[in-house]
Each structure stands twice: as structure tokens, then as C-alpha cells.
Amino acid sequence: EVLIHSLDKADQDFSRELLADVTPEQLYESALTVMMRLVFLFCAEERELIPSKPFPVYEQNYSVCTISRQLRELADQHGEELLERRYDAWQRLLAAFRAVYGGLQHNDIHIPAYGGSLFNPDRFPFLEGRKAGTTWRLEKASPLPVNNRTVLHLLEALQLLQIKVPGGGPAEARRVSFRALDIEQIGHVYEGMLDHTAKRATEPYLGLAGTRDKEPEIKLADLEKQQSRGDAEFLKYLKEETGKSESALKKLLKLEIEGLEASRFRTAANSDESLWKRIRPLAGLVRLDNFGYPVVIPQGSVFVTSGTDRRSSGTHYTPRSLTEPIVQYTLEPLVYVGPAEGLPKSDWKLKSAKELLALKICDMACGSGAFLVQATRYMAERLLEAWELARQANP
């Protein structure tokens, strides 16, 4: 959401010329791809799969962990607002993505070319300021103006997990360990992102404050229509949409928005005084974004909202607690002599490594591959066991 808002704001500042040929769906898919690239890099760096130690050039210039740490140090020393005036972090991220895709061969750094569609720079060339159909090896990049504050929030959205404190109170930020992250948990991250999509507002919307699972974006005209039905009906409607109590909603509706807060509303409304006048009676209901600005979505803006991609694509990642027993009981008769014959488990005999390697396992509806991942784990363990038994039999 932070990245899409930043890209849309940059597009607006350039008279909608930067993303003229990019649909909201493509914009959301590109943001989703950026987030999954970052997850991949965090995992690879924390597990030391990218050779940063023998090549300090990577750690100093390309590492997403380093970029995050440097930005946080600057924000703590000088305030996050300073980061809004700098744009180098986004260019460093794009360079890291290119390095993973195309590789780096130099005296001071060596990274093999991993390729793959996830990191392909030509998949979303507009992120680099290039036109569709151009190639990254020939066309000069002119990266979109994504400021360092946006990049910091992108990185920390993945690195920090908000944990509820027992007994109430504000949530505490806990750092995620990507070293210990299972592939299934990465699947859950992807699955959660598919719960949303991007749309272009055909009229003004407001993002309302609500409970954790209820922070809707609603057309301003619909809110005005509901408000015209009377206080009781309006409160009932807001309670259903936001999950907040009627007493809390009454307090929010009575809030007077003045001074700096009013100025920020005007900024969010693109200095449209007529729009601000319509928003003002409802301003207390509006939530703030990551930068402290009210979520006002003027006509023509792209915004993130609940989507149906996850449901329509059938993307529901199966947890390991289910894949482990299902894979075990499915494959045991294939890797052991005994289960199919009805022998007790104590009499089962593991087949030879040659027989195990000859097995072909297929999941016809593999989806995100949770069962195949677990099948690979299970077969790898049995194969190691078979090799060890063969070694013991023929020392």
C-alpha cells in the first residue's frame, strides 16, 4: 500500500504521464512482486546464501539488510521527514534486483545470474522508468521517484511484526527472523497479499479508521447518503463497516479538525477546498497513513482495497501441520516394504536409494506447492537414511 501510494503520488506530480500505460492491476502486481523480491533477499542474506562476506561491496551497497539499517539510523538521528528528500535507496533496491537476475562479475564481487521471472527487470519496466517492450540491457533506466522514507516503510513492514501485548496497550514491534522462516510461512505472506487489489477511484473515497480487520475505503458520496438518513442509522452503518462501538464513533464525529491536522487534510485532498468542505464533517472518522496523513483518495487516484484474487485463484496455503502427516501416510507404502503388506511398523524395511530415486511423485493440483515441498523434505530424509543403511551394510 505504501509503495502504490508513493508511485501514484509521483504519477500525479508528473501530470499522470509516468504510469499512463499501466493499469491499477499491473501496478498492484508490480508492488506485490517487489515485496516478494524483498522477502527472497532477506531470506537469502540472513542465511548467507548470497556471498556478502567475501565481497563487502555487496553488503555495503546492495544488501537490503544494510539499506534498512542505514535508513533507520538516519531516521532516528534526523527524523523520517528528512528521508522524503532523498531517493537513492530505491535505486539501490533496483540494482540489487538486477544483480540477482543478471549476476555480477567483477574483481570485488561475484554473484551468479539466477534468472527467473520474479527478478526479471523487463517484467515491470516502468519501475525503472522504462517503457514497455524495452530491455534492461540496452535501455537506460530512469527510476521512478520513490523516496527513502517509502523504502524504509517497505522494508520494515516485512522485518517488523506487531505483537499484541497481554492485558491491552499498544502493540510491540518484534523483528522477524528470516533465517528461521519456512517456505510455508513465505506462502502465507504471499497469500495475505492476494487478499487485496488496486483500483482507480472514479470519485472521492475516504479510508475509515476501524478495528484491525475492518478499515474500509468508502465512497464519500455513500457516506454522505448514509449520514442524511439520520444519526441512528448512520451510527449503525458505521459500526457495521468499522467494527467500532457507537460511543467511540460519536466521539470521532464530534472531533474538530483545525490547524496542522486541517492542513494535512487539504494536502491529502490535493488542495481542493470544495472536497475538504465535504470531508470536514466526517474527518474524525478518517484513519492516518504510515506518514501521518489522512487517507483521502481523490478522484483518479489508485488505492489498495480488499480483492478477490486469492479466492478466485484458489490460493490457500496449506499449513505444515497438515502437509506432514498427509505426505507421510501417502508415501510410506511407496518407500517401505511392509505397510502395503500389513506388517507391523517394527518389521518395515526401507527400500534402497536406487528404488527411492526411481519414484515419481506428482501433485496434479499443486497450487503454491506446499505438499510438494513437504514431499521433497520427506524423500530427502528417507534417501539420506537409505544411504546410511547401505554404508553400514558395506563399510
Q: What is each model feature region?
A:
Residues E1-E381, Q392:
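Preference for the N-terminal adenyl/adenosyl cofactor-binding alpha/beta module
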